Amino acid sequence: NVPVVPGETLVFFDEIQSCRNAISSLRFFHEQYPELHVVAAGSLLEFALSEIPSFGVGRIRSMFIYPFSFDEFLSAMGEEELLRVKNEASLISPLSDLLHEKLNKLLKEFLVLGGMPEVVMNYAVKRDINECQNVLNDLIISYKTDFAKYKKRVPSLRITEVFNSVSKQSGSKFVYSRTESKSDIQQIKTATELLMMAGLVIPVTHSSSNGIPLGAEANRKKRKLLIFDTGILQRLLGFDIRDLLFQNDFDAINKGAIAEVFAGLEILKAMSCYEKNDLYFWQREAVSSSAEVDYVLQIKDKVIPVEVKSAKKGSMKSLFIFLEEKKSEYGVRLSMENFSSYKNVNV
């Protein structure tokens, strides 16, 4: 009994992946009722879309929505002023020690909680981080239950095995044979592609990074894979969250490459939501001088290397090798440090 007023009412189809007819009806709304605003959302939606022969090409606009970013988390926690100060800080005007310490504390909380809306909402209201772990566990169970809906494509057990294996191989090149089931590599590859299609697993592809676009020199046989949320990741790995919350050095915080995953996800969330963006890394394999840079960004016509480092120490050998070889203007180091610079590296 709710009136539908064109131009004023927003019709929202949630969990639309459960009904193929509802997905197909989106084309009707565009052609027959264009003045009505319609939004559709669903989990593992890409799985369902791949099973529909034609899906409103040119009539439907897609948005790629991710869990909360760290900035959005700060806003949800009511830390608007802290967020403003953080975003206004720079190399020449860093944060005060007090605010820097507070931000690091909130960052560690965010690494544990992740950005799933239900988790963030629960924490914003109750501030009970242990209860949020239960919410994360429930979300993981829900995702794995949803995998069963796509057993016609590949057994749901294979999808679950790959999902678990991605978490264990975070921070290194993904090796199919390291999944629990080693008997059917093709099924494992199919399950991996499905998880990437659904956005639950984010690929980071090797690029030689000699120029732009980075994708022109991508080697898709060399990939790292990221779980889409750090909260989900730490639950899959069974971390003792006290290790993440109370350690002051990044080595402890970077268990399971969680800091590297966080950095990649934040880079992705900062990009346009109207296209499916790609992440790249660089690696040089040489007997006497191997090197690896965690992420490589294309910013306008520049190629910028990004390294995630531990604590307030650590060599930047790989970063400097990249800067020298690729003649990049500057590099970026991400750590628990305040804003600063060292030679041609921004911290």
Functional labels for PLM-detected ranges:
Residues P3-A22:
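Conserved P-loop NTPase "ATPase switch" module shared by AAA+ and STAND
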Residues F12, H37-S43, F64, F73:
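Structural recognition of the conserved hydrophobic beta-strand(s) that form the central parallel beta-sheet
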Residues E15, A41-E46, Y66-F68, T230-G231, ...:
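A short beta-strand-to-loop transition that corresponds to the Sensor-1 phosphate-sensing loop
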Residues E31-P53, L195:
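Sensor-1/coupling segment of RecA-like P-loop NTPase cores
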Residues S50-K168:
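Interdomain motor-coupling "hinge/lid" segment immediately C-terminal to the ATP-binding subdomain
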Residues V120-A291, L297:
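Accessory nucleic acid-recognition modules appended to NTPase machines
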Residues L297-P305:
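Active-site beta-strand-loop-beta-strand hairpin of nuclease catalytic cores
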Residues S310-N346:
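Catalytic cores of nucleic-acid endonucleases
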